[in-house]
C-alpha cells in the first residue's frame, strides 16, 4: 500500500461542488466511485487540497489517497477509463504523513467580460489587494481568521476578456469571486478605488459576488512534490 497524490481537472457545471453532500453529485463522490471501481475499496483515505463551490472549475486541484496499485501511470489511466467528468492528469507518491492541504501556493483565474473595462484602473485595483489585508468584507465569513496575504493578482487582457490571475497560499470562502466583482466594478467605472480601500479598511461596502463558472482553480503547487 502506498500514499498517492494526483492532480485532477473537472468542469464545475457537472457537480454540486467538490465536497461530498448527501444525495448530490459532487467531485468527491465521483472520485470515490472511480477509486472504488479500480482499487476495490470503500475507504481509500481520500483528501482534497482545495474545496471548490458549485459551478467552479479546476484544471489542477490535488487529491491524496491510498493505493494498492504500484504503477501510478496504470492507475491514472484506469481511473480515467472509468470516470465520468473527472480527469486524472498527473501523480506522485507521497509519505504517509504528508498533508495534501498544506500547499505552497494556489493559482486561480477569473475571466471577466472585457467590454468597457479600463485595464489601467482594473490593474490598479488589483494592486490594492496584494499583500496582507483583513479580507472580512471580501469573503463569506465562516468563522475562520480573515487576515491573509495575496502574493499577486495579475490583470491580463485576452481577446474580448480580461483574466485575473490570483496567486496565494490559501483563500477565504467566496473571496476570489468578491474581489473579481470589485475589480470589474472599478474597471467599468461603477465603483472607485477609494470604495475598495474603504472596504479593506473595514467599511461595509458591497461589490457583489462574481458568478462561479468564470472561476478556475488552475493549479495547486508544492515545493517538495514533483508531479509527472
Give the positions of each predicted feature.
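Structured-RNA-binding interfaces characteristic of tRNA pseudouridine synthases
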Residues: 1-228
Amino acid at each position: 500500500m502506498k500514499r498517492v497524490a494526483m492532480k485532477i481537472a473537472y468542469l464545475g457545471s457537472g457537480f454540486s461542488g467538490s465536497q461530498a453532500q448527501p444525495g448530490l453529485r459532487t467531485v468527491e463522490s465521483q472520485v470515490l466511485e472511480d477509486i472504488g471501481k479500480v482499487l476495490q475499496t470503500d475507504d481509500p483515505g481520500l483528501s482534497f487540497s482545495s474545496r471548490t463551490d458549485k459551478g467552479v472549475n479546476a484544471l489542477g486541484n490535488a487529491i491524496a489517497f491510498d493505493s494498492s496499485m504500484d504503477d501510478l501511470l496504470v492507475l491514472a489511466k484506469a481511473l480515467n477509463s472509468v470516470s465520468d467528468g473527472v480527469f486524472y492528469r498527473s501523480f506522485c507518491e507521497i509519505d504517509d504523513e504528508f498533508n495534501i492541504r498544506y500547499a505552497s501556493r494556489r493559482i486561480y483565474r477569473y475571466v471577466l467580460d472585457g467590454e468597457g473595462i479600463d485595464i489601467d484602473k482594473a490593474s490598479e485595483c488589483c494592486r490594492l489587494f496584494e499583500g496582507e489585508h483583513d479580507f472580512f468584507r471580501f469573503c463569506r465569513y465562516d468563522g475562520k481568521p480573515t487576515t491573509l496575504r495575496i502574493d499577486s493578482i495579475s490583470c491580463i487582457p485576452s481577446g474580448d476578456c480580461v483574466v485575473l490571475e490570483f496567486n496565494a497560499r490559501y483563500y477565504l470562502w467566496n473571496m476570489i469571486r468578491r474581489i473579481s466583482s470589485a475589480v470589474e466594478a472599478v474597471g467599468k467605472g461603477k465603483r472607485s478605488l477609494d470604495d475598495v480601500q474603504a472596504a479593506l479598511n473595514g467599511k461595509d461596502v458591497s461589490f457583489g459576488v462574481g458568478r462561479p463558472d468564470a472561476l478556475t482553480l488552475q493549479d495547486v503547487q508544492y515545493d517538495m512534490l514533483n508531479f509527472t
